Design a protein with these regions (language model features):
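A cross-family detector of function-defining hotspots
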Residues: 1-128
């Protein structure tokens, strides 16, 4: 799983990730002009995508995480990779509402330990 996240990070159109302490995820903001490149990169680690309409049929652990961050609203999407053991990679696509900026947060669902979060931070060079 961390290998696919590494491939994703290398393909991501923006450099630089920060640590989002609210959600214990790495975050990157980008301009809407980069949407095609961002979507291509997401496919490397996150083959499943859920919008507000399809969120109800997402697996339970995906719905639980989505609800823990306030739900999935219009224009937002949630991405998931395949489960590896006790972990599932997750992406949250959140437009800012200014029509030009989107944030992507990448995190882990499942039975996540401190060492898993630390490894995520290190892999994305988002040490906080």
């Amino acid at each position: 799983m961390f290998f696919s996240l590494e491939q994703f990070r290398k393909a991501w159109p923006k450099q630089g990730w920060s640590w989002d302490y609210r959600f214990s995820m790495v975050a990157s903001s980008f301009h809407v002009d980069l949407i095609p490149d961002a979507e291509r990169a997401l496919l490397l680690a996150f083959p499943e995508s859920y919008d507000p309409k399809g969120f109800a049929r997402a697996p339970e652990h995906i719905r639980e995480l989505g609800e823990s961050v306030g739900g999935i609203r219009a224009d937002q999407r949630m991405f998931a990779g395949p489960a590896v053991g006790r972990l599932v990679p997750i992406g949250l696509w959140w437009p800012w509402g200014d029509e030009i900026t989107i944030s992507l947060r990448v995190g882990l669902a499942g039975y996540v330990g401190e060492h898993d979060l630390r490894r995520l931070q290190m892999n994305f060079n988002a040490l906080g």
